Amino acid sequence: MIKQRTLKQGIKVTGVGLHSGNKVTLNLRPAAANTGVVYCRTDLNPPVSFPADAKAVRDTMLCTALVNDEGVRISTVEHLNAALAGLGIDNIIIEVDAPEIPIMDGSASPFVYLLLDAGIEEQDAPKKFIRVKKKVRVEDGDKWAEILPYNGFRLNFTIDFNHPAITKNLSTYTLDFSAQKFVQQISRARTFAFMKDIEYLQSQGLALGGSLDNAIVLDNYRVLNEEGLRFKDELVRHKMLDSIGDLFMCGYNMIGEFKAYKSGHGLNNKLLRALLEDQEAWEFATFEDKEKVPQGYTVGAQVLI
């Protein structure tokens, strides 16, 4: 039986909030089987919890934010969510003492290594996957995203920026997902921004924690980070990282093929909602026989390093 996963022990880290620029403490704790992914604002009295749910995503400007009916929010959840998806963690309590998850280095890699440091253990309950049964597609102008049946988890993403540093041959990336490929090829890809946008955002009191330490920054001609890029196509890899995190907002790993052109957090969430709302488009899948598990989900997270 393919089993659910949680952490062996809790682990804590401190970082900076991307938008506030303030110190943020993040505490990751194990959770019982069938708990799911639960985000919790511990700075509020009483604390406010947000179970991972596509419908809880109500703000996708610049990041993915969970907002409840009272307007309480947790922003910038997508990179941590991607790390959970990449390692196949089903049950976890995520406590944060601020309205946003710390940005760390702008990628999912710090979260991956935090989770691996805490340790991952299997639980005595079958792991549930969402298996796509028919194609679902959403569009917004020339942007689109779709998910189709596929026996595994494959992703194809294309970006399109009119910028000399983002050439056509660096604008498309395809991944046949596995935990190991996620860690090695996707998790280290950092978020990116253009200098003109950062200056505007900071003038509006946003992105106050943004810097060359936690983002790739481009002017009109080049990448400004002295160390350059971690991959030649790091930008499109990061958009794929975002998509993995956004699709995991349902709390289950996907069995299907995701394709997107110029998609972002909003369109990714629109696709996930459209899929889940169509009862004929998906089903839950569990696997008693490990031999029948789709390619990419067969290797345990313990074999990553």
Curated annotation (Swiss-Prot):
Binding site for Zn(2+): H79, H238, D242
Biological or metabolic pathway of the protein: Glycolipid biosynthesis; lipid IV(A) biosynthesis; lipid IV(A) from (3R)-3-hydroxytetradecanoyl-[acyl-carrier-protein] and UDP-N-acetyl-alpha-D-glucosamine: step 2/6
GO BP: any one term: lipid A biosynthetic process
Protein name per Swiss-Prot or TrEMBL: UDP-3-O-acyl-N-acetylglucosamine deacetylase
Keywords: Hydrolase, Lipid A biosynthesis, Lipid biosynthesis, Lipid metabolism, Metal-binding, Zinc
Record's function text: Catalyzes the hydrolysis of UDP-3-O-myristoyl-N-acetylglucosamine to form UDP-3-O-myristoylglucosamine and acetate, the committed step in lipid A biosynthesis.
Enzyme kind, highest EC tier: hydrolase
Swiss-Prot/TrEMBL cofactor(s): Zn(2+)
The keyword Lipid biosynthesis is assigned to this record: yes
PANTHER family for the chain: UDP-3-O-ACYL-N-ACETYLGLUCOSAMINE DEACETYLASE 1, MITOCHONDRIAL-RELATED
Family that this chain belongs to: Belongs to the LpxC family.
Taxonomic lineage: Bacteria, Pseudomonadati, Pseudomonadota, Gammaproteobacteria, Pasteurellales
InterPro entries attached to this UniProt entry: Ribosomal_Su5_D2-typ_SF (IPR020568), UDP-acyl_GlcNac_deAcase (IPR004463), UDP-acyl_GlcNac_deAcase_C (IPR011334), UDP-acyl_N-AcGlcN_deAcase_N (IPR015870)
EC number: 3.5.1.108
